[in-house]
């Protein structure tokens, strides 16, 4: 792409993102790229029409240099799934135009959130870096995979967004947490093995596998997670805390200050295997995942993703 920062560009936009503001964002992106002709070697703007549409579109994006995903973490997840279906050498670089209520992947990248003009300005001046992608039972995730209480909360926030709640980000996560807490205090028995090591028997309330530091709209569950290091960061509990302590830990996690608790363990790994005693709430980038057995791994240098300069 010697003559333009983005080359031949495909914008995949979710018009319903951020309570319908995605359509305005798609129009602005089109006007911006038309007026800033040197940014691309031609572009297209395609709007999604339903679930998994962004995956289908991204999978067919051979020949493009750049895909820009416009919307929340959901559309970014779908685009990543589509890109990962292509051979490595055929995958366009990825840029994100964050327009959503969670925007955790945008936080990881340092992108402007819910400001299409600012995000586009960052992208045309940005630089691509190799980043990892996680996999769970073969399905990619680009930011977070979680089980137990935090997964139940994440799925509840997804359902509430679909129902039209006015809450966003940390406030949405916190109120969903209060709704779920009282039903999840017994824990979820699981056998866990990290990198093929000896199996650990846990009764977990929180088990988060991260590519980037945050989930839930800014909760820094693995504050040192780095999407370029080729490792997954994992946070889980090793004891069942009483409800007041659990609520306090969730509050500390907002700032990444829960990591010193004797209840919490953090570690890094390249793979892990989880066998739950019963079906347990599970989500990958906000999408529900079903089952009791989970093979989790990391794909280093899976994608080229644009970071702000």
Language model regions located:
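ATP/NTP phosphate-donor binding region
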Residues: 1-67, 77
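Catalytic core of DAGKc-family lipid kinases
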Residues: 13, 45-48, 84-205
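Short amphipathic alpha-helical segments
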Residues: 23-25, 80-83, 107-109, 220-221
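Polar, low-complexity loop segments and adjacent catalytic/binding residues used for recognizing
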Residues: 73
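Glycine-rich phosphate/pyrophosphate-binding beta-alpha loops
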Residues: 146, 150, 208-222, 288
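Short acidic/glycine-rich loop or secondary-structure boundary segments that cap or lie
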Residues: 150-153, 200-202, 214-218, 242-245
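Gly/Ser/Thr-rich active-site loops/lids in small-molecule metabolic enzymes
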Residues: 159-172, 217, 223-244
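ATP/nucleoside-binding phosphotransfer catalytic cores, i.e., glycine-rich phosphate-binding loops
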Residues: 194-201, 226-227, 232, 236-309
